[in-house]
Each structure stands twice: as C-alpha cells, then as structure tokens.
Amino acid sequence: MLDSKLLRTELDETAAKLARRGFKLDVETIGKLEEQRKSIQVEVENLQSTRNSISKQIGQLMSAGDKEGAEKIKQQIGSLGSDLDVKKIELDAVMAQLDDIILSVPNIPADEVPNGKDENDNLEISRWGEPKSYDFELKDHVDLGEMGDGLDFASAVKITGARFIVMKGQFARLHRAIAQFMLDLHTEEHGYTEMYVPYLVNADSLFGTGQLPKFGKDLFHTEPLTEKASDEEPRKLSLIPTAEVPVTNLVRDTISDEADLPLKMTAHTPCFRSEAGSYGRDTRGLIRMHQFDKVELVQITKPEDSMNALEELTGHAEKVLQLLELPYRKVLLCTGDMGFGSHKTYDLEVWVPAQNTYREISSCSNMWDFQARRMQARFRRKGEKKPELVHTLNGSGLAVGRTMVAILENNQEADGRIAIPTVLQKYMGGATHIG
C-alpha cells in the first residue's frame, strides 16, 4: 500500500500521479478525514498532557498531608481518562476510514511508464527472433496434442470441469522438462535459490502481496476446516494464484541485514485462478486455465537497487525464451494495463503461430515498497539503527503451459511431429521429437 504520509503531505501531487492510471483519488473525503484526524490528535495530546501535569500534583499533596485534595485530583484524572478514551476511539475510527481508502489505492507508476488506457497503449521495447514461415497448413496446440494423444481436455472436463487439462506420455514429460530446465537455469546460472512452498496460504499472506482485500473473487478459497486444533478457530485458506504470494511473504515481518540483499528466490508451483471476468476468452486450449504451472522469480532488494534488478530479472526470463529459440517481444506496460501493486512492469510476449500474434508468457514487475509496507518487510543498513522497507520484485520465468503451447506450435513439422528444443532433449531422455 502507499505511504499514508503521501496522502497527508502531498495529497494533490499523489492524486495527479494516480490519475495517470485512470484512478480517481477522493481528495475531498481524504482531506476532510485528515483534518478530523489532526483535530482529534491535538485533543488527545492535550488531554494526555493535562493528565500528566495534574498527576504530578498527587504526590505533592500527599507529601503535604492533604489527602482530601489528592483524592479530588484523582477524581479529576479519572474524568480526564474517560474523556481521553472517548477521543482515542474517535481517532481510531477516523484512522480506520483512512486505512480503508489507502487499501483501495493502487501503486504510483514510475515516471517512465507511458500513459494509456489498456494493452493497446503498451510500448514495444524490443523483439527477439523471427517467426518461422511454414509451407504446410498450421495446426494449433490443441490439434497437435490430440493427434499425439497427449492433451486430453475431455477427461479433464469429466473429472473437474472446463479450463483444466490431462496430459499424457511425452506431452506430460515435456511439461515436466520445461519446468525442470527453467529451475536449473535460474538456480545454476542466474543465482536464485530454489524454494518449495505451500500451495495454500492464509489471508495475511494474500494481504501482504496485494490480492486481498480487492481481488478475493479471483481466488479459490477453501471452506473453513471442521476439525480444530485445540481451541483454534477454523482457518479459511486459499489456493495460491502465483508462487509470488508464498515466496514474497517469506520476508513478511522480518528485518534483513543489508549484506544479505538482494535475496533471489525461485519456485515451481501450480497456480490456481478463478478467471473471474474472463468468460468467453481463450476458451480453447492451454492459454487460460484454472490450474497451470509456473516458475516464479522473486527478488528482495534495497530501494536504490530495484530498478536495475527489474532489468536483470526480466533478462533472466528472456534468457529462457532465447535458449528455447522462441520468438518474442518485450513491452513496457502503460499506466492503464499495469497490475494493482506495480510501479513498473515489462511483459514478454511469445509468438503463437496458430493465432498469428504474440501472447503474454511472462510479466515482470517492480512493486517498489508497496508490498513491503503491507508486509512490514524491512532491512537495516550497516551502522544504522532504524530499519527501512525493502523493495520487492517478481516475474514469471516462465509460465510452463504457455511455454509448451509456444514449443508445440513453433516447432511443428509437416508430418505432425514436434521438434524438441535442443536444451530440453537431455530432460527428454535424448529424444529429438515428439510423435
């Protein structure tokens, strides 16, 4: 969340920056609440000061033997205490209203982020690789998977429902190989530590990374557990929409040493999304699923290092595509297409031949101190007593299912076989083709 000081001391400037995102900050309401807060705060401080001053008189009166006078002072202090309690309740109520507003406010975009309404206003930064030309009729990944008896959507519908998949044989192995290759690359060459994390998280974790309270409808939630451990309340947990949630929350409520930063972590997990609001979009194939695998990259940095870290992290995701020899483009998201908590985001879009277009395969974001403030994730500089908020970054390195789509479609041959990228062949038992 944003620093509340910005809303107290730079309200108009903050509103103007948020307006670039198409977000209208309720300046009038915030201004009124801030005036109330300051007024009540002054009353609280005056009451505390008066109470403290009068309290000193009790000892003096008792020393002088004036018990009656001391008793009157005690009654006066009791009355002041009651007034103080009332004012504290009023102050808490105003602060709660301000907090509710702050939680609904997105992050401020970086100055270099282009203004825009949606994906059509994103800025293309670069392209890598050239889409192939084919002298035969292209098939999409669904047809290729069904021809090879490797993608079984019908069984998934029977077992669960739409937007799920059953993979078999060499297709399942390819899916596993892609994830293993990504993990090996990021841990052995890019300096990340592999993490195994829970796939179910609590509300505090989802709040920390910004999914709650605003985006609860996008998640799959468990029902409260009926079994209780001792006298604990039943827990409501949620399936992770991305490994960003559990991995980033590893630094929640912690103070890291400056020497330990940056922290670079990666995890391969399934991800679960309800895809609320996407009815009718990408209903065919693996592009938009309720359950999909992803290798996530997370970095925790010092504030002055986070922008360079974003370039590095994005480059790590790009390296995966380059080694797989998949054409892609890199775009800088405009203000209207950025995620709620993002300060700056690059998307990588891979070429999908059957759709004759580029599709998102990775989103790499610098969240600035937005998540860190929610999580109270801090670090302490050498020689300093007061800790500072870290900066958090995350990105897909990559989405496994969409990578598989790109491999199947870009590497298809006239006879329906799929050429396995060279870097994956050792994970496929030396096979060069599927089919």
Curated annotation (Swiss-Prot):
Q: Name one GO biological process term.
A: seryl-tRNA aminoacylation
InterPro entries cross-referenced by the UniProt entry = aa-tRNA-synt_IIb (IPR002314), aa-tRNA-synth_II (IPR006195), aa-tRNA-synth_II/BPL/LPL (IPR045864), Ser-tRNA-ligase_type_1 (IPR002317), Ser-tRNA-synth_1_N (IPR015866), SerRS_1_N_sf (IPR042103), SerRS_core (IPR033729), tRNA-bd_arm (IPR010978)
Enzyme class comes to ligase
Biological or metabolic pathway of the protein = Aminoacyl-tRNA biosynthesis; selenocysteinyl-tRNA(Sec) biosynthesis; L-seryl-tRNA(Sec) from L-serine and tRNA(Sec): step 1/1
Q: Which domain of life is it from?
A: Bacteria
Name the catalysed reactions. Answer: tRNA(Ser) + L-serine + ATP = L-seryl-tRNA(Ser) + AMP + diphosphate + H(+); tRNA(Sec) + L-serine + ATP = L-seryl-tRNA(Sec) + AMP + diphosphate + H(+)
The subcellular location is: Cytoplasm
CDD domains linked to this entry:
SerRS_core
Keywords, comma-separated and alphabetical: Aminoacyl-tRNA synthetase, ATP-binding, Cytoplasm, Ligase, Nucleotide-binding, Protein biosynthesis
Q: Which SUPFAM superfamilies match?
A: Class II aaRS and biotin synthetases, tRNA-binding arm
Which of this chain's residues are annotated to bind ATP? 273-275, 360-363
PROSITE patterns (UniProt xref)? AA_TRNA_LIGASE_II (PS50862)
**Enzyme Commission no:** 6.1.1.11
Task: Please give the function described in this protein's UniProt entry.
Answer: Catalyzes the attachment of serine to tRNA(Ser). Is also able to aminoacylate tRNA(Sec) with serine, to form the misacylated tRNA L-seryl-tRNA(Sec), which will be further converted into selenocysteinyl-tRNA(Sec).
Quaternary structure and interacting proteins, as annotated: Homodimer. The tRNA molecule binds across the dimer.
Q: Which NCBIfam families match?
A: serS
Q: Which family does it belong to?
A: Belongs to the class-II aminoacyl-tRNA synthetase family. Type-1 seryl-tRNA synthetase subfamily.
Report the domain remarks: Consists of two distinct domains, a catalytic core and a N-terminal extension that is involved in tRNA binding.
What's this protein's name?
Serine--tRNA ligase
Q: Which organism is it from?
A: Vibrio vulnificus (strain YJ016)
Name the encoding gene, please.
serS
